[in-house]
């Protein structure tokens, strides 16, 4: 069973874990901001309380934390998303992607899901393409991908 826990409801232990994972080299290498300090992290989480354009979730599978998913630039038509599995945990990318699609299309009710992918993040790009995302733009560092709800297969419940 999958459970999402809003970052606004995290306990202090979870906040510290996310901080540690976020700065882990396997994760931070694919972030625009490579390293954050703990004060920045706390400020970011506090600011989420007032920001309706952003939603961040800790993802649990059968009571075990498996990763983080987020939604930013949320409008009635689209949103951008991000995800990462906790370091050294393999095989949960598709689970996280399923939760992203369910939340975006069923809760946020957007038509289009968007993301940017570092060009050297081959695992993420492969996951997105397996989920029918298409590349709609690129620059020297990133591919920009999107998925329209109309192209989405029935979502597992």
Swiss-Prot record:
Q: Which organism is it from?
A: Campylobacter jejuni subsp. jejuni serotype O:2 (strain ATCC 700819 / NCTC 11168)
Which keywords has UniProt assigned to this entry? Acyltransferase, Transferase
Instruction: Show the PANTHER family listed in the entry.
Output: GNAT-FAMILY ACETYLTRANSFERASE (PTHR43415:SF3), SPERMIDINE N(1)-ACETYLTRANSFERASE (PTHR43415)
* Highest taxon listed in the record's lineage: Bacteria
Q: Where is the N-acetyltransferase domain?
A: 5-152
Q: What is this protein called?
A: Acetyltransferase PseH
Question: Which InterPro entries does this entry report, sorted A to Z?
Answer: Acyl_CoA_acyltransferase, GNAT_dom, PseH
Q: Name one Pfam family in it.
A: Acetyltransf_3
| Membrane-traversing stretches | none
| Matching Gene3D superfamilies | 3.40.630.30
* Gene name per UniProt: pseH
Q: What is its EC number?
A: 2.3.1.-
The protein's job, in short, is: Catalyzes the third step in the biosynthesis of pseudaminic acid, a sialic-acid-like sugar that is used to modify flagellin.
The Swiss-Prot or TrEMBL record annotates one GO molecular function as:
acyltransferase activity, transferring groups other than amino-acyl groups
């Amino acid at each position: 069973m999958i459970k999402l826990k809003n970052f606004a409801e995290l306990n202090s232990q979870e906040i510290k874990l996310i901080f540690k994972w976020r700065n882990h080299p396997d994760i931070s290498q694919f972030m625009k901001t490579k390293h954050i300090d703990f004060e920045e992290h706390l400020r970011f989480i506090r600011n989420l309380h007032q920001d309706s354009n952003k939603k961040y979730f800790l993802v649990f599978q059968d009571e075990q934390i498996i990763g983080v998913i987020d939604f930013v630039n949320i409008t009635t038509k689209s949103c951008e998303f991000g995800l990462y599995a906790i370091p050294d945990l393999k095989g949960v990318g598709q689970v996280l992607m399923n939760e992203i699609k369910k939340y975006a299309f069923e809760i946020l009710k957007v038509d289009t899901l968007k993301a940017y992918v570092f060009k050297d993040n081959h695992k993420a790009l492969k996951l997105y393409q397996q989920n029918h995302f298409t590349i709609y733009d690129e620059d020297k560092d990133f591919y920009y991908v999107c998925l329209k709800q109309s192209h989405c297969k029935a979502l597992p419940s």
